[in-house]
UniProtKB/Swiss-Prot annotation:
It is found in: Virion. Pentamerizes and interacts with H protein, G and B pentamers to form 12S pre-assembly complex. By binding with protein D, induces joining of twelve 12S complex to form the procapsid. The procapsid has an external scaffold made of 240 copies of protein D, 60 copies of the internally located B protein, and contains 60 copies of each of the viral structural proteins F and G. Upon genome packaging, interacts with protein J. The mature virion is composed of 60 copies each of the F, G, and J proteins, and 12 copies of the H protein. One of its GO terms (molecular function) is structural molecule activity. Assembles to form an icosahedral capsid with a T=1 symmetry, about 30 nm in diameter, and consisting of 60 capsid proteins F. Upon virus binding to host cell, one of the spikes dissociates from the capsid and the virus interacts with LPS through the exposed EF loops on the F proteins. After the genome had been ejected, the channel formed by the F proteins at the unique fivefold axis remains open. GO terms for biological process: symbiont entry into host cell. Its main location: virion. This is Capsid protein F. Disulfide bonds: none annotated. Pfam families: Phage_F (PF02305). Keywords: Capsid protein, T=1 icosahedral capsid protein, Viral genome ejection through host cell envelope, Viral penetration into host cytoplasm, Virion, Virus entry into host cell.
Length: 427
């Protein structure tokens, strides 16, 4: 009888590791990733602290930090190629990598350094894009389809792709193709009442899909069903942690006179993924994004910018609010000196559902606060996404970019795998 080992017990493996990461405001950065195997039981307890780089001014507003863990099966990345790869076994053709740009930081958005020939596995690059396209991009914008990291802008592959601002009336508008009117063709002298009802029903289902059901899984949920992450070919969100980074306010940095002050932000956190059974080979990626609220120095309430107020503007009449179509407004009605030609659409009465932040005039003359100062872009997508460069001026030093994180990933995986001793003692 052969003494060749053909199987292994399911034993725990400690995959704990340290991560020292740095990133920029509003960009989605991979903190860590772990390859997993079919049959694994994966659990993670991430503990650490996030710090903002030294601020030029005292701490004015907290920043929000979001941490996510996703599971992406390799089959979602490689498709039939992966199925054939596993069926062919040792005779399978190798899985080709993707190519990065020059520099050891050309794959930093993936939480890794590229190989000596500037290559990374495709499952990392495409897995990141799948996460962004399914969970972070504006629903009405096109998917990211970079074939290689080398096709990405340098700021994106170094610091991650920009995500949307936190919600406000001007950063979360309706889709650009939203209709503000709908016509129905009728006879010259009569109106088909039944046809009118049918037209209302058609309009309702079209609006539901335009605003709230942009993805197939949303439509199935509306019908009372659901689609699995596998059937929908999307990354599975295992855990999300959200917190506000506040820390402490200011430090005196001049020992002799304490005449110089700078803001300090430090926040400890814990991100825990409960035990997850891995159904097939894949990767678990943990990503983070840090954002300030979209406070703008020049923002005003719509009732100020509109100037000539109608009954519909100010009355907040429930009958009108519930039945009027979406309203097209201009940036000029929200920001002093903005062009009137820059239009976007909001729900009727939205100015009564939100309240703008206010920044007093003396702040405008000072740099160093986490506020938007330049007028918002006239391009809708640029306005929705965080303007990362806006925050460069608020930091005294960017040696560790905008924020830095020191964490330990306490990871335990139960895996069918021989022990190190068994692997050494072959046959």
């Amino acid at each position: 009888m052969s003494n060749v080992q053909t199987s292994a017990d399911r034993v725990p493996h400690d995959l704990s590791h340290l991560v020292f990461e740095a990133g920029k405001i509003g960009r989605l950065k991979t903190i860590s990733w772990t390859p997993v195997v079919a049959g694994d039981s994966f659990e993670c307890d991430m503990v650490g602290a996030i710090r903002l780089s030294p601020l030029r001014r005292g701490l004015a507003v907290d920043s929000r930090v979001d941490i996510f863990s996703f599971y992406i099966p390799h089959r979602h990345i490689y498709g039939q190629q992966w199925i054939n790869f596993m069926k062919d076994g040792v005779n399978a053709s190798p899985l080709p990598p993707v190519t990065c740009s020059s520099g050891w930081d050309s794959a930093a958005y993936l939480g890794t350094i590229p190989s000596s020939t500037l290559k990374v596995p495709k499952f990392l690059h495409q897995g990141y894009l799948n996460i962004y396209n399914n969970y972070f991009k504006p629903p009405w914008s096109d998917d990211l389809t970079y074939a290689n990291p080398s096709n990405m802008p340098s700021e994106d592959y170094k610091w991650g792709v920009r995500v949307a601002n936190l919600k406000s009336i001007w950063t979360a508008p309706l889709p650009p193709d939203t209709r503000t009117s709908e016509n129905m063709t009728t006879g010259t002298s009569t109106i088909d009442i039944m046809g009118l009802q049918a037209a209302y029903a058609k309009l309702h289902t079209e609006q539901e899909r335009d605003y709230f059901m942009t993805r197939y899984r949303d439509i199935m949920k509306e019908f009372g069903g659901h689609t699995s992450y596998d059937g929908d070919n999307r990354p599975l969100l295992l855990m999300r942690s959200e917190f506000w980074a506040s820390g402490y306010d200011v430090d005196g940095t001049d020992q002799s006179s304490l005449g110089q002050f700078s803001g300090r932000v430090q926040q400890t956190f814990n991100h825990k993924v409960p035990r997850f059974y891995v159904p097939e080979h894949g990767v678990i990626m943990t990503l983070a994004v840090t954002r300030f609220p979209p406070t703008h120095e020049m923002e005003m309430h719509y009732l100020v910018g509109k100037e000539n107020l109608t009954y519909t503007d100010i009355a907040c009449d429930p009958a009108l609010m519930a039945n009027l179509p979406p309203r097209e407004v201009s940036l000029k009605e929200f920001f002093h000196s903005s062009p009137d030609s820059a239009k976007f659409k909001i729900a009727e009465g939205q100015w009564y559902r939100t309240q703008p932040d206010r920044v007093a005039f003396p702040y405008n003359a000072l740099d160093g606060f986490p506020f938007y100062s330049a007028l918002p872009s006239t391009e809708l997508k640029d306005r929705v996404l965080v303007n990362t460069n806006n925050y460069d001026e608020i930091f005294q030093s960017m040696q560790l970019a905008h924020w830095n994180m020191q964490t330990k990933f306490n990871i335990n995986v139960y895996r069918h795998m021989p022990t190190t001793r068994d692997s050494i003692m072959t046959s």
